Amino acid sequence: MRVIFMGTPLFAVPSLRAVAEADNDVEIVLVVTGKDKPRRSQRAEPEPTPVKKAAKELGLAVLEIDDVKDARFADTIARYRPDVIVVAAFRILPPAVYELARLGSFNLHASLLPRYRGAAPVNWTIINGDRETGVTTFFLGRKVDTGNIILQQRTPVAPEETAGELTERLADIGAGVVLKTLKRIRDGEAEPTIQDDAMATRAPKLTSETTRIDWAEPVDAICDFVRGLSPKPSAWTVFNHRKVKIYRVAPGMFQLPEQDEQQKVPGALVVDGTRMFVMALDGWVEILSLQMEGKRKMGAADFCCGFRCEEECPSFS
C-alpha cells in the first residue's frame, strides 16, 4: 500500500515513525511538510520542521510546500500514485489533492470528534475542564473536521496535565490509532461513522485576546485556563504596565490579615516571602512559574526576590 504522509509539527512525528517502521506492506512513498523556518541569526541555516527532520532520519523522500492549492502540488501528488494519504497536523487540503488517494485520505485529530472541531482541540479541552479526551481518525471531506469517523481512542486528562504534556501523550496514542486505521483500510474493514453535527463543539485558533487571564473567574477555571495554554501560546496578564506570561499556577491557601481585607479584589497580588498569590473570584491562585516581558522564565521565588512595585496595592490585570 503506497502512502503519502503529510504533517509538520512534533505531534505528527510519532505517527510518521510508526508507519515508516511498521512491519507490513505499507510503504511511505513521500512525506509532505512545511517550508524550513528562518532562524534569528541570518548566518544560521533555516530550521527544518520536526517532520522533515524525522523523515530525513528515516531516509524518506520529502516535499516542502507553501501553497497546497497550487495545481502543481496536485500534479506532484498524482505522480506518486498514493493508495492512502495520511494527514496529521497539516494544512487544509483541497479535494483536488485528497481525492487522489485510491483508498481515501484520512486525518488524525487530537480530540473525540465531533467535539472540538478546529485548530486548537487540546488547548480547549483543558481550558474547559474536560476530564476525558482522545484522538480520532476520519476521512477527509469538503468541510474541516467533519468527515466520517474511522477510529477513536479515549484517554483521561490528568488533573495537573498541561496542553504541552497532553499533546505529547496524544501524539503517541495517535500513532497506534493511525496504524490500526491503515490496516482497516488495507483490509477493507473500515466502517466509517457519520459525525453527529448536533454534538459538535468548536476549538477556534487562539489569539492574544483569548489567552489573557480574567482574574474575576473562579480559581479552578483560572487554573484550567493556564494549564490549557502552557507552554504555548501561554496565558498572560499585565503587571506594572508590562506583559507577564503565566505558565504554572495552583489553588492557593492564603489568608490576608484583617487590616488588608480591602485588597481582596480580583487581580490583587500578594507576595508572601518567596510565594505569590493573586485574588480570583472565589479565592487565591498561587503563581508558580512566570515570565516578565523581556526577561527569562522564572519560578515564583525568583520573582519575589526581586519584587518591586510602584503601586500601594499591586495587582495583575
Curated annotation (Swiss-Prot):
MF term (GO), any: methionyl-tRNA formyltransferase activity
Domain of life: Bacteria
Residues given in the record as (6S)-5,6,7,8-tetrahydrofolate binding sites: 111-114
Family: Belongs to the Fmt family.
Signal peptide feature range: none
Function: Attaches a formyl group to the free amino group of methionyl-tRNA(fMet). The formyl group appears to play a dual role in the initiator identity of N-formylmethionyl-tRNA by promoting its recognition by IF2 and preventing the misappropriation of this tRNA by the elongation apparatus.
Gene: fmt
Keywords for this protein: Protein biosynthesis, Transferase
Name of the featured protein: Methionyl-tRNA formyltransferase
Keyword Nucleotide-binding annotated: no
Gene Ontology CC: one annotated term: cytosol
